[in-house]
């Protein structure tokens, strides 16, 4: 880290580009474990690289970093029940040299009480942008809610009737809304209300991430994802 960066407060936001995935956190979080590689990087003892946008760049597994960052925030390891990439996550923990995380991954005891399970809601906003307009023009935006909590999807269908004309796709575990270039403010309003509704149902935001794609010569696609989780108790059938 450059000496000039020390003017930042430890709670100021820092954006990391991990394998093409952007994460925003604080210096306090990144240096929670001073003996780790991240603690050395952001404590000034280890060289850092930046991408063309000025974000700190780490050439590692982008999707798995969400679990590393969440551990830094809470000092707890919380994984989805169907998580299968333990070996890959151990390699990431070894790379970042976070000893408490390594111990958690090597500990055979269950991550959750045996009578509970984790419910997950994924909210994504996929926005297609024109490359050649100035200012940048939004071509289309799609909001998608994906979850196995059917009561939540039913609530969204019942309480968000104001946006019914934009509801383009409903499936067993998914509801989607599509907005055209003139509906930007409506999409933002719905997104804010959806986040409020999801959190009021007892979910807490676990992770946010941004992914940039270029699918066509004249379009860029930007995808924002928010993951919400809550613990629920198992019921006897």
Curated annotation (Swiss-Prot):
It is found in: Cytoplasm, Myofibril, Sarcomere, M line. GO terms for molecular function: ankyrin binding; cullin family protein binding; identical protein binding. Pfam families: BTB_2. One of its GO terms (cellular component) is M band. Pathway: Protein modification; protein ubiquitination. The keyword Nucleotide-binding does not apply. CDD domains: BTB_POZ_KCTD6. Residues 10-110 are annotated as: Interaction with CUL3. SUPFAM superfamilies: POZ domain (SSF54695). It comes from the Eukaryota. Residues 1-104 are annotated as: Interaction with ANK1 isoform Mu17. Keywords: Cytoplasm, Growth regulation, Tumor suppressor, Ubl conjugation pathway. Its main location: cytoplasm. Highly expressed in cerebellum and brain. Expression is down-regulated in medulloblastoma. Probable substrate-specific adapter of a BCR (BTB-CUL3-RBX1) E3 ubiquitin-protein ligase complex mediating the ubiquitination and subsequent proteasomal degradation of target proteins. Promotes the ubiquitination of HDAC1; the function seems to depend on KCTD11:KCTD6 oligomerization. Can function as antagonist of the Hedgehog pathway by affecting the nuclear transfer of transcription factor GLI1; the function probably occurs via HDAC1 down-regulation, keeping GLI1 acetylated and inactive. Inhibits cell growth and tumorigenicity of medulloblastoma (MDB). Homopentamer. Interacts with KCTD11; KCTD6 and KCTD11 may associate in pentameric assemblies. Interacts (via BTB domain) with CUL3; initially a 4:4 stoichiometry has been reported, however, electron microscopy revealed pentameric states with a five-pointed pinwheel shape. The interaction with CUL3 is indicative for a participation in a BCR (BTB-CUL3-RBX1) E3 ubiquitin-protein ligase complex. Interacts with HDAC1; probably indirect as the interaction is requires the presence of KCTD11. Interacts with USP21 (preferentially catalytic inactive form). This is BTB/POZ domain-containing protein KCTD6. The lineage of its organism: Eukaryota, Metazoa, Chordata, Craniata, Vertebrata.
């Amino acid at each position: 880290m450059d000496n000039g960066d020390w003017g930042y407060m430890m709670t100021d936001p820092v954006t990391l580009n991990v394998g093409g995935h952007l994460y925003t956190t604080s210096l306090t979080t990144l240096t929670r474990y001073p003996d780790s590689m991240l603690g050395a990087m952001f404590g000034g003892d280890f060289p850092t690289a930046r991408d063309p946008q000025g974000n700190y760049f780490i050439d590692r597994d982008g999707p798995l970093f969400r679990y590393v960052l969440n551990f830094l925030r809470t000092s707890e390891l919380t994984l989805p029940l169907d998580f299968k990439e333990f070996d890959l996550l151990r390699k990431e923990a070894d790379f970042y040299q976070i000893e408490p995380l390594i111990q958690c991954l090597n500990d055979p005891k269950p991550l959750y009480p045996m009578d509970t399970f984790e419910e997950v809601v994924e909210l994504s906003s996929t926005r297609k942008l024109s490359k050649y307009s100035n200012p940048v023009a939004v071509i289309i935006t799609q909001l998608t809610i994906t979850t196995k909590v059917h009561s939540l999807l039913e609530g969204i269908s019942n309480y968000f009737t104001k946006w019914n004309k934009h509801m383009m796709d409903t499936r067993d575990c998914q509801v989607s809304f599509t907005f055209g270039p003139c509906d930007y403010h409506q999409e933002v309003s719905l997104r804010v209300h959806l986040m409020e509704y999801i959190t009021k149902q007892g979910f807490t935001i676990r992770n946010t991430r941004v992914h940039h794609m270029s699918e066509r010569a004249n379009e860029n696609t930007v995808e924002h994802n928010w993951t919400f989780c809550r613990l629920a108790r198992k019921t006897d059938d």
